Amino acid sequence: MELILISGLSGSGKSVALNLLEDSGYYCVDNLPVVMLTVLIGMLKEEHVHKVAVAIDARSGHGIDLLPGKLDKLKRSGINLTFLFLFSHEETLLKRYSESRRRHPLATKGQTLEEAIRAERALLDPISDLGHRIDTSGMKANALREWVRQFIEAEPGQGLTLMFESFGFKYGIPLDADLVFDVRCLPNPHYDPELRPFNGKDKPIIDFLEGEDEVCRMRDDIARFVDTWLPCYIRDNRNYLTVAIGCTGGQHRSVYIAEWLAGEFANRARVLVRHRTLAGT
């Protein structure tokens, strides 16, 4: 059985991810109490259900403390388990709740929205590092759906998943990054009016950047660094490694280098690529 477990902060996109998985053929269960997880999986195995996605949130209360043990038990039973933890900056969550006008699930009478968000963050903190952390701050629903689709369509198998992520420093450093490389010192196509409308996946930008020695040297240096230390991360039993590449706006230099790195490592690991602040995503 393939099991994708989703948890994280309310308002960070769990429902968006779960809906995409349901559309992709997964048997989905939302807001499942932790104590019921192994019971549900046992029942679905008897029914020969092979693809399952379950969302668990803070409404499980202190039952959240039981989750690490439940996950270990499921892994020992031979289930192919993936755990995704979604989160966002507090200001992003406040904005989303303001726009949706929905009530926070942990909000109590006399408690502010900020207090409810912080209480939920504290409650879920012990499980936030059990799997792959995804910072959805600034991500639109369609971008999150595309990321989940790319994730589940990636070549299955054991081993580490290597994510190359581009971003713009003016929007902030992604909190889910394990390694961050700053490429703002490289020549910037933004200052060429003819190149500005393109992005780092377009041939005019690729040709411009690959014609600059500094770009090629930094690109190759980053690849060597990742290649040198990747075995160490694998030995540490890491399931995921997110390498973030940042330029000023996240449109040209970082996008090009993230795409190039994804191509370089495609035959050495399970590779994903994401462009956090690319226009139109």
UniProtKB/Swiss-Prot annotation:
<dbReference type="InterPro" id="IPR005337">
    <property type="entry name" value="RapZ-like"/>
</dbReference>
<dbReference type="GO" id="GO:0005525">
    <property type="term" value="F:GTP binding"/>
</dbReference>
<feature type="binding site">
    <location>
        <begin position="8"/>
        <end position="15"/>
    </location>
    <ligand>
        <name>ATP</name>
    </ligand>
</feature>
<dbReference type="Pfam" id="PF22740">
    <property type="entry name" value="PapZ_C"/>
</dbReference>
<dbReference type="Pfam" id="PF03668">
    <property type="entry name" value="RapZ-like_N"/>
</dbReference>
<dbReference type="InterPro" id="IPR053931">
    <property type="entry name" value="RapZ_C"/>
</dbReference>
<feature type="binding site">
    <location>
        <begin position="57"/>
        <end position="60"/>
    </location>
    <ligand>
        <name>GTP</name>
    </ligand>
</feature>
<comment type="similarity">
    <text>Belongs to the RapZ-like family.</text>
</comment>
<keyword id="KW-0342">GTP-binding</keyword>
<comment type="function">
    <text>Displays ATPase and GTPase activities.</text>
</comment>
<dbReference type="InterPro" id="IPR053930">
    <property type="entry name" value="RapZ-like_N"/>
</dbReference>
<protein>
    <recommendedName>
        <fullName>Nucleotide-binding protein Daro_0070</fullName>
    </recommendedName>
</protein>
<dbReference type="GO" id="GO:0005524">
    <property type="term" value="F:ATP binding"/>
</dbReference>
<dbReference type="InterPro" id="IPR027417">
    <property type="entry name" value="P-loop_NTPase"/>
</dbReference>
<keyword id="KW-0067">ATP-binding</keyword>
<keyword id="KW-0547">Nucleotide-binding</keyword>
